[in-house]
Amino acid sequence: MAALTGDFGPSSVCLVIMSFFCRLFFIFSFSFLVLIAQAEDKQKSIRALLVTGGCCHNYKYQSKALIEGVAKDAKVDWKVVNEGGSGTSARIAFYDDPNWAKEFDVVVHNECFANTVDEKYIRKITSVHKAGVPAVVIHCAMHTYRAAKIDDWRKFLGVTSRRHDHQSRYPVKKVLPNHPILKGMPDNWITPKDELYIIEKMWPSAQPLAKSKSERNGKEHAVVWTNQYGEAKIFGTTYGHSDATFDDPVFQKMIARGLLWVTGKLKD
């Protein structure tokens, strides 16, 4: 300390040391607060599982468009499972874990496996939803497991469908125009080119929100609906065949609001 002369005496050294530790304390405190804020922000995000894949659709593109579109209206952390290949029958290994949905607030089903008929496998999925895990179901999810003899998946969806009309641009008529999921949907919305699914049965637990009319026979079919399956809220739409539909802002907002609604986070 002999080199410390003049004004740079012991008191100055103490001030320097105190200043250093104050700055260090500030840095650590700030970093800690940032970590807390990030953790809280993470907790506010909806944890969503997207199950996709199977026959007849561009699922890689649709997944990307879905995630980007929903992000305009909802903060969501996604996990995408695309394990079933591109055929009509698959057993996704992800479901083998009895706690497969434990980490998620909602499951989005946009898959197409019409010829999977294994009842035990199907119930691995539906039992978890019936216990309370909400879901959003899109397009060919309604034809998934359609060859199965059991109705568990159909009751989960809220509708039974096994076929569809041709592709066209279908006008959408709101039947519950004040439902919060439909907020922002124009009264005159016409879909991009898509398929109209023929609804054979609307299950008693389901409520149609919007319908479209068949160009073949004029019959109306539900195209947007909600369902209560056990303890879980379900939102569904049969539209979603084309990439253009997934790019459509009205469709994107509807899916986002449906996802928020089933998770209890839709505030307006």
List where the protein language model places each region:
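N-terminal secretory signal peptides that target proteins for export/translocation
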Residues: 1-22
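Bacterial N-terminal signal peptides
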Residues: 22-34
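Sec/Tat signal peptide C-region and signal peptidase I cleavage site
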Residues: 35-39
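Extracellular ligand-binding/catalytic regions of CAZymes and related secreted enzymes
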Residues: 41-45, 72, 102, 216-221, ...
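Active-site rim elements
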Residues: 53-56, 167-169, 241-248
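Catalytic beta-strand/loop cores that center a nucleophilic Ser/Cys/Thr
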Residues: 71, 76-79, 103, 162, ...
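A glycine-rich, often tryptophan-bearing local segment used as a flexible ligand/cofactor-contacting loop or short
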Residues: 114-184
